[in-house]
């Protein structure tokens, strides 16, 4: 399953000390790095309690993948209810996707932002993309763009 492989890669990046487990601290730090926002202690503890099936206070890879899969499934149900938002996001994505590759590259992001009056260099655009580039390919797919816009 491709999504599961992607979640496993994300798990590896969250597991900063390489012990095969994600602590509440690692989860909080990675959410901040990914979304640029702090997650309140209560939310971190609630997620940990929800997913920690063996009760050790840590998330192993299997627990993490199950949590993310369930969260994604819940998100899919909510997305079905909001077709207009999705249509608008697709239109916005098409404006940023200028190279015909079906994704937003650092260069296409730079060009569109310049048209909108914000002048960033390619490295700054790469950093923006990196925050939401879940599969690590250096570009934003529509799903990654949607995640960024909904954050």
Swiss-Prot record:
Domain EF-hand: 2-37, 39-74, 84-119, 120-151
Gene3D superfamilies for the chain: EF-hand
One Pfam match: EF-hand_8
Residue sites binding Ca(2+) 3 per the record: 133, 135, 137, 144
GO MF: calcium ion binding
UniProt-listed CDD domains: EFh
PROSITE patterns: EF_HAND_1, EF_HAND_2
Binding site for Ca(2+) 2: 52, 54, 56, 63
Binding of Ca(2+) 1, residues: 15, 17, 19, 21, 26
The keyword Repeat is assigned to this record: yes
Keywords for this protein: Calcium, Metal-binding, Repeat
InterPro entries, alphabetized: EF-hand-dom_pair, EF_Hand_1_Ca_BS, EF_hand_dom, EF_hand_pair_protein_CML-like
Listed PANTHER family: EF-HAND CALCIUM-BINDING DOMAIN CONTAINING PROTEIN
Function: Potential calcium sensor.
Protein name: Putative calcium-binding protein CML23
Source organism of this protein record: Oryza sativa subsp. japonica (Rice)
């Amino acid at each position: 399953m491709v999504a599961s492989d992607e979640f496993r890669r994300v798990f590896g990046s969250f597991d900063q000390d390489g012990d095969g487990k994600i602590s509440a601290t690692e989860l909080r730090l990675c959410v901040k790095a990914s979304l640029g926002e702090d997650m309140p202690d209560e939310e971190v503890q609630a997620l940990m309690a929800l997913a920690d099936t063996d009760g050790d206070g840590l998330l192993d890879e299997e627990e993490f993948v199950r949590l993310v899969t369930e969260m994604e499934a819940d998100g899919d149900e909510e997305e079905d209810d909001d077709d207009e938002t999705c249509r608008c996001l697709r239109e916005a994505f098409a404006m940023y996707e200028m190279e015909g590759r079906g994704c937003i590259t650092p260069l296409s992001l730079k060009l569109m932002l310049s048209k909108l009056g914000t002048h960033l260099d390619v490295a700054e655009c790469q950093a923006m993309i990196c925050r939401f580039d879940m599969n690590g390919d250096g570009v934003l797919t529509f799903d990654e763009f949607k995640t960024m816009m909904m954050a």
